[in-house]
Amino acid sequence: MANPVAKRSFRLRLHVLGSKLHKWLAIFVGLQVLLWMGTGALMSFLDLEEVRSEHVISRAAQTLPDDAAIPRWLSDSDDITAITTRVLDGKTVTEVRRADGAVSLHEPLSGRILSPIPAATARSIARRAWVGPQTSIHAARLVDESVGTEFRGPFPAWQITYNDVANTRVYVDASSGAVLSARSDTWRFFDFIWGLHIMDWTQRDRINSWWLLLFGIGGTIIAISGFVLLANRFPRTKRRARHGQVAR
């Protein structure tokens, strides 16, 4: 038969150990756990369509005319992986993708190269893409390197800034004329709290950092030690209730 004194002693030691673990880890990990819960709630609250600026930026392809010219000047090229004839900024163009990843735009009949597109064309593409409240374009600049966490390529690309309340920017591929991404203050706020959530405060694209792993394990231990403390309290509560009934 188990020794009741030894059993109580073991429970007491377990309770003390669980209490210490719970207390010190809660102090160390508690703030980040609070940030996880708070940032998770905020991200759930934000409308993903608004974060992506889909309510003001359209990426729908323009319809290709029935009489569009079919390019014949590319038949002798071996390194081409894709040829697409489409409408860009109201004009028919042929997009050529090559094995090395290069993209170029051409005049369909002559093959005259049209890329990289100039600032005026990038502005016009951005104006056509805008479907929000009436606004104008504030600035256009060519970027060939990452713009913080806001845009990481491909490069070169045109950064077009609108005169709207959300400080919206679109990035237009200088090689293909495609609208690559749209960023606004809502997206920047979402990106900031995402960085807090995954504990990557600079690049905000690593979800397996040592910081996140360490605090994740710490949070798990807090939960387990909390259950240990709770389990050790239940028998005491029952014994107190039983002794109270006997006393009566």
Describe each region flagged by the PLM.
Residues A2-R248:
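Conserved histidines in hydrophobic membrane contexts and catalytic metal-binding motifs
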